[in-house]
Amino acid sequence: MKRRRFWSVLILFSLIGQVAWVVENMYFNVFIYHMFNASPREISLMVEASAVAATLTTIFVGALSDRLGKRKAFIAFGYILWGVSILAFAFLRADWIGAAFPAVANAAALGCTLVIIFDCIMTFFGSTANDACFNAWLTDSTDDSNRGKAEGVNAMMPLLAILVVFGGTMWADTSNASHWTILFLIIGGVVLLCGILGLVLIEEPKGLLKQAAGCYNAQVRKKRR
């Protein structure tokens, strides 16, 4: 039973996490361009800011997870907040922003700014849940007898996620704001549901102990190397 639960958690969280990353990596630049007429400079700024957010989050939250000796809470609640942050993109539309902020002269410019900020927030939760803690949970939950198999399954998920996303979004018109709203509601809802399931399905790895107070800075320095 525990073995089946482990593989179920691995496949579910790895696949859903990679689906969310594919949407972020492949579609956000298209979204900000079509919906808010973003310039190449603004698109580059969004990519750079989210990359910095992902790197710093993985380093510092990963070390914090080691320090506290906790994986489940970071993963489950991280996926829940990750889903909520994706859902927020469903409400980023030029017409809605213009109606909500009538005093703003350029709703598209405000929209670009909000997309960049929300992307960093989404990346923070995604990197917390998936990059920093889920991958650590996978290592903690395996040993020499099954780690290679588990890592192999985890490694193939980015490719499978690309097929899922591109195959599942063939209906979408990237110039239609309503289609973006539907897409973000679906992806955000699935990630949110995944996090809720994690509260029940994920088990803390055996032998994972809370570390001494001085270990946090040492872990951060180690991860930076």
Question: Would you name each region that the model predicts?
Answer:
Residues M1-A54:
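Helix-loop boundary and gating motifs at the non-cytosolic
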Residues M1-R4, K206-R225:
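Juxtamembrane intracellular "pre-TM" segments in multi-pass secondary transporters
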Residues F28, S127-T142:
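Intracellular juxtamembrane helix-capping segments at the cytosolic ends
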Residues I43-S65, V84-S85:
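Central cavity-lining transmembrane alpha-helices of secondary-active solute carriers
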Residues A53-T55, G148-D173:
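Glycine-rich segments within core transmembrane alpha-helices of 12-TM secondary carriers
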Residues F77-A109:
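C-terminal ends and interior cores of transmembrane alpha-helices
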Residues A94-I97, L199-A213:
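Helix-loop junctions on the cytosolic side of multi-pass membrane transporters
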Residues T181-V200:
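Symmetry-related core transmembrane helices of the 12-TM Major Facilitator Superfamily/SLC fold
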